[in-house]
Amino acid sequence: MLDLKFVQNNLDVVRESLEKRGSKLDVNEFSDLDSRRKSLLQEVESLKAERNSTSGEIAKIKREGGDASEIIARMGEVSGKIKALDEDLKDIEAAEREWLSSVPNMPDESVPFGKTEDDNPVIRHWGEKPEFDFTPREHWDLAVELGGVDFERAAKLTGARFVVLKKWGARLERALTSFMVDVQTMDHGYTEVIPPYIVNRDSLFGTGQLPKFEEDLFKLKNWEYYMIPTAEVPLTNLHRDEVLSEDDLSIAYCAPTPCFRSEAGSYGKDTKGLIRQHQFHKVEMVRFAHPDKSFEDLEKMTGHAEEILKRLGLHYRVITLCTGDMGFGSAKTYDIEVWLPGQDKYREISSCSNCVDFQARRANIKFQPKDSKKKQFVHTLNGSGLAVGRTFVAVVENYQQKDGSIVIPEALRPYMGGLEVITAE
């Protein structure tokens, strides 16, 4: 959430930010509310000043033995007006906060201007695309044929956009998860957390999913609880309403969790395979950074996500999201896209974002500077390290062989009991 006073004093800056993002949010709506708030505030302050000055007059009349009943009656009316105006003022301020809760974060000045994903610049590549002497197959054919993935039974159990993993498929999913967690905790210093997979509304407000994106969430019937769309939600909210020590920053967490998304805006997209599921696993990274070092931490976190792909020998590219393609809470985002030869395209496998103080303000997460009595909001960052299902897809498609088998990347073999090649049973 943006700072209320900043918005009140910089409406033109906010309007420009919304235009860069392609947002249709009407700044004039807030401007009208704020004009009304200022008018009410002036009226209330004027009436309170009148009441205060008149109280001295009443006391004087009483000391002199005079009749102050008319003035007292008039002041009763004034008090009633003040009470009514205070209620109106509360309603206006609530409306301002509601409007503010729907305003996306302001893009950092280093973010390139653009309208769609087509405007996202590629900033680097790693590795080379694998070469095949045959036409590579999509994972949804090959993995099913090898018996590790079952979409039909998943559809019977639940419906579309679900999968059953079994045999080598279940083991590969588990191996990838353990490998990712080990790299992030042992090599990059993250603290592993297993959080609840169900959270309350306050948590989702803190990270920005509510109130604007409720349709993307799975809500529990008769409960004000939701299934997590990403572990970013519980990890960030671990420190909601807390004041952290400056010496503790940066704090880094990672969590392997299932994620649950309705994919409300994805009708007709990626209807085959594992790319877009209602339930999927992801290893999430979250950092709480000092404001002076958060963009340095963003580069570091992005490198931590890239390291997984490097160790797996998977070709990828990194792009910077333009202003029109950024997530709601982000000030700057890098997407990592892995090459999928079966689909002959790059697909997002990680998104690493610096939200600066946007989430911290919503969730009231501060730190105490050593050289100041005034507490400051921390900066929060989040990123996938990585999306497990999409990494599963990348391994299957990049390491497939002409005979229909799949070679296990060397880094994963210790997690697969030494298995080197997946073949049909």
UniProtKB/Swiss-Prot annotation:
Lineage: Bacteria, Pseudomonadati, Thermodesulfobacteriota, Desulfovibrionia, Desulfovibrionales
Subunit structure: Homodimer. The tRNA molecule binds across the dimer.
A Pfam family hit: tRNA-synt_2b
Enzyme Commission code: 6.1.1.11
Protein name in UniProt: Serine--tRNA ligase
Keyword match Ligase: yes
Family: Belongs to the class-II aminoacyl-tRNA synthetase family. Type-1 seryl-tRNA synthetase subfamily.
Organism: Maridesulfovibrio salexigens (strain ATCC 14822 / DSM 2638 / NCIMB 8403 / VKM B-1763)
Function: Catalyzes the attachment of serine to tRNA(Ser). Is also able to aminoacylate tRNA(Sec) with serine, to form the misacylated tRNA L-seryl-tRNA(Sec), which will be further converted into selenocysteinyl-tRNA(Sec).
Residues that coordinate or bind L-serine: 230-232, 284, 384
One GO CC term on file: cytoplasm
Molecular function GO terms recorded: ATP binding; serine-tRNA ligase activity
SUPFAM superfamilies associated with the record: Class II aaRS and biotin synthetases, tRNA-binding arm
EC category name: ligase
